[in-house]
Amino acid sequence: LFDAAGLMWLRPTSLQRLLWPAARRFALVAQEFDKLVGEQGLAQGSSWLAHRMAAGTQVSGGDHVPATGPAVILANHPGMTDTVSLLASLASRPDLRVIALDRPFLRALPNVARHLIRVPDHEVGRMGVVRAGVKHLKQGGALLTFPAGEIEPDPATFGRRKAVDSLRGWSDSYVLFARRVPQTRFI
């Protein structure tokens, strides 16, 4: 994972030696998560990881997600635990693809990467993301997207107002999905 994060060029320092055990544990958990995703699917692997990360999670609104047919789930992104819990809650959609920023860490998880539509850092390739999303929706698939494109303020930490204000920065790219695949359900 250090290599995937582009950190292998760093010479060992006292700080690195101090952080190495925690980084190794994280890498082993990520490796096991990816293995489970390959064997059992994204939702099951995410459920395993969510239980490791949090004492408990409560998800509501899952009944709004249709079991079949084109669907786009728009979600805020306050952090990793929320994301993993959301993925675990979408077990009814094994066809789920996640629109996510292209990061070396995610590419280092091959089983997880198969469920992603990666958004490049540069705008040149972003229409390819829309085309891939539209194709998946036309095949009756489900998409999960985080329209802010970044980690957002957690309402539990920063307050509801700051979290709601962050929604103004959401991309309206989901409108393209609605135009191209009008029967899509948006949740």
Could you say what each language-model-derived stretch is?
Residues 1-71, 81-85, 113:
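Membrane-anchoring hydrophobic helices of lipid-metabolizing enzymes
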Residues 56-187:
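Soluble catalytic domains of membrane acyltransferases
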